[in-house]
Amino acid sequence: MRYIRLCIISLLATLPLAVHASPQPLEQIKLSESQLSGRVGMIEMDLASGRTLTAWRADERFPMMSTFKVVLCGAVLARVDAGDEQLERKIHYRQQDLVDYSPVSEKHLADGMTVGELCAAAITMSDNSAANLLLATVGGPAGLTAFLRQIGDNVTRLDRWETELNEALPGDARDTTTPASMAATLRKLLTSQRLSARSQRQLLQWMVDDRVAGPLIRSVLPAGWFIADKTGASERGARGIVALLGPNNKAERIVVIYLRDTPASMAERNQQIAGIGAALIEHWQR
């Protein structure tokens, strides 16, 4: 009897560890919504099978903001694969073509940039003018939306150019997607025959080289983990990230997180997305 009593005491002694463990992903998302006084949309999808692992408001609309730039460069690469575009083609532009936040393109007014360089600038530095120049090559917002329909995404829509597309007005369906649709589209671009293997590798590499996502999931990523991502932001209470993650330096899952309608500061939005990412990673490791 004494032995049994000691075993029970030993077992109970371990329970506080479970009580004080980090919250499960959905618990963290609900906590984030409460702290943000806004809405969170999220999906975690297995890259190989397309199976949904975790989801919250996954079929609700959220502003894409700059996360659309991954899809845009996917559309550009599809044109390259079809022989209608070349990554080496030089595009020249003028001062009046520049919009706010163009840290790369503003330095190349004299010499222009290639299509490939514009894609790199749009994804790795979120250069808005680079995105607009690329958008013109695929037929503008309507052309990009048509590309989405062609690959089976009947939800995601782009209606405006940079920087107006970041307006993120409450209830506005323009320039929006759902976490589920964005994840499915990203998976198609990276795993199906919509793009050649070479173009898939190039799109993924641009996301790996992202240089403006440091405060989000990258800030909580364990050593040796893979990440490729693209973020988006709006002054009107929205923030977002699309990412591929995995241990052992392999892309195994797609994670899409969007926030909207929050009065929280950008730093607070970043912190909440990082917290959701940390909860997903910890749950994954169990």
From Swiss-Prot:
Substrate binds at K230, T231, G232. One of its GO terms (biological process) is response to antibiotic. One of its GO terms (molecular function) is beta-lactamase activity. Pfam families: Beta-lactamase2. InterPro entries: Beta-lactam/transpept-like, Beta-lactam_cat, Beta-lactam_class-A, Beta-lactam_class-A_AS. Disulfide bonds join C73-C119. It is an enzyme of class 3 (hydrolase). PROSITE patterns: BETA_LACTAMASE_A. It catalyses: a beta-lactam + H2O = a substituted beta-amino acid. Keywords: Antibiotic resistance, Disulfide bond, Hydrolase, Plasmid, Signal. Its EC number is 3.5.2.6. Residues 1-21 form the signal peptide. The active site is at S66, E164. Belongs to the class-A beta-lactamase family. The class A beta-lactamase family has a specific amino-acid numbering system, sometimes called Ambler or ABL numbering and often misspelt as Amber. A multiple sequence alignment was used to derive a consensus sequence and then the consensus was numbered taking into account insertions and deletions. This allows use of identical numbers, e.g. for active site residues, despite differences in protein length. UniProt always uses natural numbering of residues, hence there appear to be differences in numbering between this entry and some papers. This enzyme hydrolyzes cefotaxime, ceftazidime and other broad spectrum cephalosporins. This is Beta-lactamase SHV-2. It comes from Escherichia coli.
